[in-house]
Every structure is written in structure tokens, then in C-alpha cells.
């Protein structure tokens, strides 16, 4: 929140814990890539709230909707200039697929009904993957914008919005016990990496680690650490706030070292 507010932008947080309708859906089944899976109450449970934003803003104005693990390294105001006025929303594409974790939405045009979308998801009428990449809304016009607005775990001179996409290496969690399910891994994959480690072969520590790991890119780690330190120095949050979040295992003390 601080990384955006320091540029004078108003920020509103959408919280799963404050949305009773969505809370009632947690730990129920959805379709994901054609297979039924549990929509768990973990680090990713907030993702569905992306589709509430236009309604929450009374279908007015252009609004920037981001995941909580996206940080503004520069003022993102230019995104408005890069948005085509004929488009419903603007976002970054990866592998020719639009990404919904960062969207500039023209809320006057995008009339998503959150309850209908969520009910359709949990009634198996929409696949989660189709929801995340907008296939559920075929009439939507999407403006493709630069990756600098959703830079996945890398920083360069052009980066405006940094997205720490790999949950297990998010810098503010380093060293804490992981609190999410590795849905993309099979038990066999995990077992295989354990065996490789035991016999001394090269293995993927992310597959088997029970703790959050150090981010592999020191520039990304330093950017995030600097934002936390800057916010602390400006009394954006108190030492009491920090102690509370550390006690609740939401942040690691390492982020302030």
C-alpha cells in the first residue's frame, strides 16, 4: 500500500476476511484446468476479489486493480496515458495470455457482477483458469501494455510495477514456515526431489522446502527491503505494528535487517 500512496494515489484494500459471501465459498471445489480442486483459504484466496473492483467502485472511473504482492517502484500514472480509450481494460500479456493480477479497468464499461461470477465458478460453469485470463468474458476488449507494469520477479531501469510472483521467495516472508499449498506439484514430483537431495544430486529446493526461501535476485530483494525500511523510517507503521505482524507470521524480521 505504501509504495502507491507515496506517489499520492488513494488505495483501497479488498480483504477476503471482510467479504462474507466469498468466505463462505472457501475450501469448496472449483474447476481448475478441467479438474476439480479445493479453493483453499491460503495466500492465494484473495485472487477472486479482482473481479469485485468495478462493482465496489460503483462502476465509475478508471481504476487500477493489483495483487498485494505488486509494488510501485515508480509512479504508475503513465498507465492511464498508455490505456486505449476504446478498451475495457489494459493489462500485461505473458506468452500471449492476458494477466489479470494487474489491470487498469474502465469501470464504466466493465459491468462484472461479482456474485454471479463466483457462483458460476463454484457451480463448475467457469474454469478458474478461464476466469483469470478473461476467457469467461468474450466481449471484453483488452489493451496490451508494456511488461514494465507487471514485471515478474525482475528489476531494470524501465520497471514501474514489480510483481513478486513466486510465493516461496517473497522477501518479506524469508525464513518463515510456508502457509500455502503447492497445488502445481504432484506428490511424485515432491518425492523425487527429496530423493535427489538425499543422494546428493542437484534438486529444486523450492519443491521440498517447508520454509520461505531467499529471493534469487538480489536487486528484487533490495527493492522490497528498501520500501519496507523507508516506510518504517517515515512512521507509516509503528514498531508495535511490526511486532504484531511478526507474531502473526505475516512478515519476517529479515526484511528490516
Question: What kind of feature is each model-predicted range?
Answer:
Residues 2-10:
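Short, acidic, metal-binding catalytic loop of nucleotide-sugar glycosyltransferases
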Residues 11-56:
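Active-site-proximal specificity loops/subdomain of glycosyltransferases
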Residues 49-95, 104-110:
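GT-A fold catalytic core of metal-dependent nucleotide-sugar glycosyltransferases
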Residues 17-20, 58, 70, 107, ...:
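Short, flexible loop/turn elements at secondary-structure junctions
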Residues 97-98, 157:
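Short, solvent-exposed loop/turn segments at the edges of secondary structure
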Residues 53, 89-91, 100-104, 142-144, ...:
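Conserved hydrophobic/aromatic beta-strand scaffold that supports enzyme active sites
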Residues 8, 15, 25, 111-257:
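A glycosyltransferase accessory/donor-loop signature
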Residues 1-2, 50-51, 146-148:
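Short alpha-helical segments and helix-capping/turn motifs at coil-helix boundaries
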Amino acid at each position: 500500500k505504501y509504495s502507491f500512496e507515496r506517489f499520492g494515489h488513494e488505495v483501497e484494500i479488498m480483504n477476503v476476511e471482510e467479504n462474507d459471501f466469498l468466505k463462505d465459498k472457501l475450501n469448496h471445489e472449483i474447476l481448475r484446468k478441467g479438474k476439480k480442486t479445493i479453493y483453499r483459504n491460503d495466500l492465494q484466496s484473495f485472487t477472486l476479489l479482482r473481479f469485485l473492483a468495478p462493482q465496489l467502485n460503483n462502476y465509475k472511473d478508471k481504476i487500477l486493480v493489483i495483487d498485494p504482492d505488486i509494488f510501485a517502484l515508480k509512479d504508475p500514472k503513465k498507465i492511464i496515458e498508455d490505456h486505449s480509450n476504446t478498451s475495457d481494460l489494459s493489462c500485461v500479456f505473458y506468452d500471449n495470455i492476458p494477466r489479470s493480477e494487474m489491470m487498469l479497468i474502465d469501470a464504466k464499461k466493465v459491468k462484472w457482477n461479482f456474485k454471479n461470477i463466483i457462483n458460476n465458478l463454484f457451480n463448475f460453469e467457469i474454469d478458474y483458469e478461464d476466469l483469470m485470463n478473461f476467457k469467461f468474458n468474450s466481449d471484453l476488449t483488452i489493451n496490451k501494455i508494456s511488461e514494465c507494469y507487471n514485471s515478474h520477479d525482475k528489476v531494470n531501469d524501465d520497471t514501474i510495477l514489480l510483481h513478486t510472483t513466486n510465493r516461496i521467495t517473497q522477501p518479506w516472508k524469508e525464513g518463515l514456515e510456508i502457509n500455502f499449498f503447492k497445488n502445481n506439484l504432484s506428490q511424485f514430483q515432491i518425492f523425487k526431489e527429496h530423493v535427489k537431495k538425499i543422494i546428493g544430486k542437484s534438486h529444486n529446493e523450492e519443491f521440498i522446502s517447508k520454509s520461505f526461501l531467499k529471493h534469487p535476485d538480489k536487486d528484487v530483494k533490495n527493492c522490497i527491503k528498501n520500501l519496507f525500511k523507508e516506510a518504517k523510517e517515515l512512521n507509516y507503521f509503528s514498531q508495535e505494528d511490526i511486532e504484531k505482524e511478526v507474531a502473526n507470521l505475516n512478515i519476517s524480521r529479515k526484511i528490516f535487517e
